Amino acid sequence: MSSPTGPAPGSPDFDAASPSPGAAPGLPVRMPRRQTGRHRKPEPLAAPEGAPALVLAVPGTPSGASRSLAEEVSSIARSELPGLDARIGYVDGGDDEFPSLEAVLAHAAAEHKDRVDADGQPDPGPAAVVVPLLAGPDSALLRRIRQAMMNSGSGAELTDVLGPHPLLAEALHVRLSEAGLARADRARLFTVATAADGIILATVGGEEAVQAAGITGMLLSARLAVPVLAAALDQEGAISRTAEQLRESGSQQLALAPYLIGPEISDGLLGAAAAEAGCASAEALGAYGTVGRLVLSNYAAAVGITLPTQAQGVPVR
């Protein structure tokens, strides 16, 4: 029987309302609630089961250095999307140590077919998505990548190159600051004695690459508040002409900023370009964190995966 203040002692209702033996007497038992609203923790993101492989197309002559760089970029992408099947194919590869892009794609296609046949379901999509490890367009290299894709018979998809993009402007800024050629933080107005007052943005791929690099160059110029001009390493005299143009506009201390990942150029080319311009050079972009994030962002856009904000960026076209 219940009283006005609650169930009577000894009644079934009272027993049901009593706290468990381990609970403190007289205290309410708080049940865990699922967090909602903007403070709710996001669900952990993972690659969908059966998602296409991400194949990183690495240009240039294969080497231990280019393999380490590509593996680090792939590792960054995997850390942002657990379960991602990331592979590396070399445009100029051709052996077990440095497998060619064509061979990697053919192997991915064979595995994809076996999986589809085992599931007995319609083909869900491409076997692989190819992401060129290039900061900007290089028509000759992209033509070779497309040819390898066609020869593989994989039906793989090809994404855009990584730039132009604000994240690449950030990476360029970091590389310049590491070389002592720019302030490490544009918000801190301390003086760097060797800071450049004019930047040559070095790229490869001819005029198309120069125009694309110029877009990222404008973003870099806004970050550093110094003039930035793009020039092609593969156009004779372009670097020295650009250096002269900057000096004529008032720049006294120039710096070379490679708008390059690294494997796409031969050893010594950057040093020769810096000597031609009469200035110091920063390192190539390499496996900087945003490079791996852009690789993943291009893959995700092709596959239809929505990434968290920190793992993607808004491209500039």
Feature annotation, model-predicted:
Residues 1-317:
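Active-site-proximal alpha-helix that buttresses catalytic centers in soluble enzyme cores
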